[in-house]
Amino acid sequence: MRQYNDLFKIIHREGYIFIASFALVSFLLASFNEKLGCIGFIATAWCIYFFRNPDRFVPISDDLVISPADGIIQEIKEALPPQELGLGDVEMIRVSIFLNIFNVHVNRIPANGKILALHYNPGKFFNASLDKASIYNERQSVLMETDKGQKIVFVQIAGLIARRIVCDLEEGNEVKTGERYGIIRFGSRVDVYLPLKTALLVSKGQTAIGGETIIADFGRKKIAEFKFERR
């Protein structure tokens, strides 16, 4: 029974209906044409791969901000946070992470703290790698206060192919670094907004691993001082 449960744990629940549908169509195709059946089973395997939900070894420290998503650090710049969160006209450091269709799309909490506000904003579906995607695309914005008293923002952004954002958070939730909180289907972007003068530990073009890569350190500790937990 445990192995059965573990099998479902490693696949995000958002993928169940897709995998079942792909598998059913594949069996139907195979009954008529072997080659079409093979194509269908390849598509089913890719669907399983896309919705994979692996455990990660999360660095544990109240001073850390970790990557909420797998992908490439597309851009680091000063920018205004989403206006719908009511943070005013004070710029923050924005770290943008672009996810292609081969990345893990499960999103994770970037720091220990409390969720202060959430806002869903319907929008367009520009290519998520473009800078204007942060402003115009469909997005789910989350404002949190870390256990160190820092306010940070993380935003799930739909892309050219992604057409569904899932966020399981509610205002008032107490959250821990590395916890899973949602998913974006089929190519997307996640922005993280941090206070100015935050000590960043990533650079543009770097590959980030959600739940593991340290984006920033408010305390500037040495890596040997961190503890890690599997989550």
Curated annotation (Swiss-Prot):
Provide the catalytic activity annotation. Answer: a 1,2-diacyl-sn-glycero-3-phospho-L-serine + H(+) = a 1,2-diacyl-sn-glycero-3-phosphoethanolamine + CO2
Species of the source: Rickettsia akari (strain Hartford)
At what positions is Pyruvic acid (Ser) found? 188
Quote the Pfam families the UniProt record gives: PS_Dcarbxylase
NCBIfam families found in the cross-reference section: PRK05305.1-1, PRK05305.1-2, PRK05305.1-3, PRK05305.2-1, PRK05305.2-5
- Mind listing the GO molecular function terms for this protein? phosphatidylserine decarboxylase activity
* Cofactor details (free text): Binds 1 pyruvoyl group covalently per subunit.
Q: According to Swiss-Prot or TrEMBL, what is its membrane topology?
A: Peripheral membrane protein
* Localization annotation: Cell membrane
| Protein name per the record | Phosphatidylserine decarboxylase proenzyme
Site entry (Cleavage (non-hydrolytic)), positions: 187-188
* Modification after translation (UniProt): Is synthesized initially as an inactive proenzyme. Formation of the active enzyme involves a self-maturation process in which the active site pyruvoyl group is generated from an internal serine residue via an autocatalytic post-translational modification. Two non-identical subunits are generated from the proenzyme in this reaction, and the pyruvate is formed at the N-terminus of the alpha chain, which is derived from the carboxyl end of the proenzyme.
Keyword Membrane on this protein? yes
| Assembly with partners or alone | Heterodimer of a large membrane-associated beta subunit and a small pyruvoyl-containing alpha subunit.
